[in-house]
Amino acid sequence: MPRIGIEFNNVCNLDCSHCFRSIYRGGAENNKDLFLPLDVLEKILIEAKPLGYAHVAITGGEPPMHPRFGEALDIIAGRGYSYHFLTNARNFQKTLKAVSAQPLRRAKLAGISFSLDGATEATHDKIRGKDSYREVVTAIAMCQALGIEASIITTINKANRHEIDQLALLGAHLKVKRQIFGHQNPTEHNMGADLILPLGEWRAVERDVARVMTGFRHDISMAVGFYTDYYLPRCAPLTHDDLNIDYRGRLTLCCQLSNYRDGDKDGEDVVGDLKKESLAEALGKLMNLVNKVHRERLAMAVDPKQKDKLHYPCLVCIERFGKTSEEPMLVQMTGVRN
């Protein structure tokens, strides 16, 4: 289903060691610049409907920290969109109350995705902070009791790489609908924290995830960015099946590049300000950028010195759009083999 990813804010109540976003960590309720204005949200939804988009993926920051979170859900539901959102589960009872406050909000909720980065409290809390593991597990149990579809998203790094089997088992125990594993994108911060696995280990991670896919009843998958022998882009942002709107109301190429932690200024991936122009106008600019990226990838695919990089497409985009100056990971992109 074509969907729009919308960043509600650029604020979070955790300070996770692996986070790749440049985000305000702490209380910022009075800083309006960090929250998507609701009139901009409604404008985007009105303009996206005739283009065939019917679902909103709400991200952040921590989306429920938007001071008008419930009103934002009313706008989404009222415009006929289904939605889901990603959360770290902090203050989840308040979040659940907001979701359930109006019948249409609850009816249009397709599910809630939870960030869970360890099969044990020790591992998860080492990455995300004290008590966060219990908050996530409790929140998922609350969703199950209320009939809300819950999913788990895990970023694999050195701290939790050994827990893939246990994480899948935990997902089954918690009766989640789906479970997604993804690689850790590099930043100066998480490279400095020694969290990034060597690129040569990524294939082993993918094999472990592929193995657990067949051993459990719930849906287990790898997030886009895993090893591929198909050199030309086929991810949802580069086919326009996923649009990404940042918290400033701007159309960007991809959520994985948006507000990147090492970036000190806007890059070419920011294509249009939807406060000032229509979604159709900005989407035309995005199409031009996507066509440019396709041509660049084609040139790389026929260049023996460059084509090996294309096995990991997300890393290619991180390099292409200058999102990090962290060289060790980018150097490893040449010469990747099965």
Describe every region a protein language model picked out.
Residues 51, 107, 174, 312-315:
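Structured loop/turn residues at beta-strand edges in well-structured enzyme cores
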